[in-house]
Amino acid sequence: MPKLTTCLALLFGLLLGGSLAAPAFASDAGPSGSDSDTPYIDLAPAFVTNYDGGGRLRYLKVDVSVRARKPTDEAVRHHMPYIRNSLVTLFSSQLEENITSTDGKEALRLTALEEIRRILTKLDGAGAENILELYFTSFVIQQ
């Protein structure tokens, strides 16, 4: 019985010690000054749309994030419905051969980036150069 008690005390000590160390470790992992000035913005929820599959109904699901300098990140959030509408239209207009290749996905990514820049220029008059990148964090095709 003393051996069991010793093992339990040791286990409890390890668990407690690990939980106390975790907050200090997490605080060191914060963003650096330059990264905090260019936040990532998830355009959630995922875009789910059908696309031209040569007569068959096919679906595309895309998760998108953009990286924007402040204060343009607030403009992206403010105009999110307009941006999402334009991207849904863009994604649904794609042909199957354009989205199944790596080059096609890259071209679509760049087109989506330019579309967001165009929208912000149109609605805010400036700030398009502050949209640094657009990333597909998930890209699923149902064929």
Model-based region annotation:
Residues M1-Q143:
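Flexible, low-complexity charged segments
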